[in-house]
Amino acid sequence: MVSSTTSEVQPTMGVKIFSAGVSACLADIITFPLDTAKVRLQIQGEGQASSTIRYKGVLGTITTLAKTEGLPKLYSGLPAGIQRQISFASLRIGLYDTVQEYFSSGRETPASLGSKISAGLMTGGVAVFIGQPTEVVKVRMQAQSHLHGIKPRYTGTYNAYRVIATTESLSTLWKGTTPNLMRNVIINCTELVTYDLMKGALVNHHILADDVPCHLLSALVAGFCTTLLASPVDVVKTRFINSLPGQYPSVPSCAMTMYTKEGPAAFFKGFAPSFLRLGSWNVIMFVCFEQLKKELMKSRQTVDCTT
């Protein structure tokens, strides 16, 4: 990503969007059980989510879910997760370079920190509004329990879209847009800008070449910084999206209820699976993204040479 440090032909916007979407979907498939564990830990202690089963730690949560609800439960909501990455990650990551160039007006080499942050803000914000319905369905599918005696709210992904729209309202599919917007603005800026800066520093100071080890290390650093900053907003977003109608009058009310009933530590519930998930997700996505861009451009150049 993001600022090229080589003389290779630059990927087109279409190549970047396609590469981002494919890489994000692959990363989501591999790391989805960690995301499900994160959601369960985040809603633990909430009124409607309380049960006799307590989740402890990342592996403990995954093991408990597999034993009590079956292995498929770890991937409940995956179709919505894939839809989310297609509509969300492909735009926020794929358009980042193009928007960054727009803000720098092509005059800054390399682009300034302000241009990078502005690009992250814009692409993250636009992507949230487009992909929010998939986020709502994904979280609710991950949060609902299939334990004996508890009737699931939804029988499947598409049933969830229909039930939410008909029994609550169409606007409910955009429930939690405010905290999700805050979360993803933080994530997009921190993730992309940190990765961009880290990669640039490693390459420009000749510590690592612009290749897989550089991409891997940059992605890990970006994942940790992003998780640390986004965790409080992420927990509030998950609680608010998963809440029953009228449970929380507003996002601030949800945050205040968490603080008064569970204390400040509640805002960092699920931090370990969040970092494991986001760190591993970043590594898979960014490494695949970089390599896929290169291979697609090589293929395009080969086709151009033969025609």
From Swiss-Prot:
Reaction(s) catalysed by this chain's protein: H(+)(in) = H(+)(out)
Lineage, top-rank taxon, reads Eukaryota
Q: Which residues bind fatty acid 16:0?
A: K56, K269
Q: Which residues lie on this side of the membrane: Mitochondrial matrix?
A: 33-73, 134-178, 233-266
Instruction: Return the Pfam families for the record.
Output: Mito_carr
Q: What is its main location?
A: mitochondrion
GO CC list: mitochondrial envelope; mitochondrial inner membrane; mitochondrion
Instruction: Describe activity control.
Output: Has no constitutive proton transporter activity and has to be activated by long-chain fatty acids/LCFAs. Inhibited by purine nucleotides. Both purine nucleotides and LCFAs bind the cytosolic side of the transporter and directly compete to activate or inhibit it. Activated by noradrenaline and reactive oxygen species. Despite lacking canonical translational encoding for selenocysteine, a small pool of the protein has been observed to selectively incorporate selenocysteine at 'Cys-254'.
Membrane topology term reads: Multi-pass membrane protein
Alphabetical UniProt keywords: Ion channel, Ion transport, Membrane, Mitochondrion, Mitochondrion inner membrane, Oxidation, Repeat, Transmembrane, Transmembrane helix, Transport
Signal peptide (from-to): none
Mitochondrial intermembrane-side segments: 1-10, 97-116, 196-212, 290-307
Gene3D superfamilies with a match to the protein in the record:
Mitochondrial carrier domain (1.50.40.10)
Q: Which family does it belong to?
A: Belongs to the mitochondrial carrier (TC 2.A.29) family.
Provide the function of this protein.
Mitochondrial protein responsible for thermogenic respiration, a specialized capacity of brown adipose tissue and beige fat that participates in non-shivering adaptive thermogenesis to temperature and diet variations and more generally to the regulation of energy balance. Functions as a long-chain fatty acid/LCFA and proton symporter, simultaneously transporting one LCFA and one proton through the inner mitochondrial membrane. However, LCFAs remaining associated with the transporter via their hydrophobic tails, it results in an apparent transport of protons activated by LCFAs.
Q: How does it assemble?
A: Most probably functions as a monomer. Binds one purine nucleotide per monomer. However, has also been suggested to function as a homodimer or a homotetramer. Tightly associates with cardiolipin in the mitochondrion inner membrane; may stabilize and regulate its activity.
- The name under which this protein is listed is Mitochondrial brown fat uncoupling protein 1
Q: Which organism is it from?
A: Rattus norvegicus (Rat)
- Cite the source lineage: Eukaryota, Metazoa, Chordata, Craniata, Vertebrata
- Give the gene that encodes this protein: Ucp1
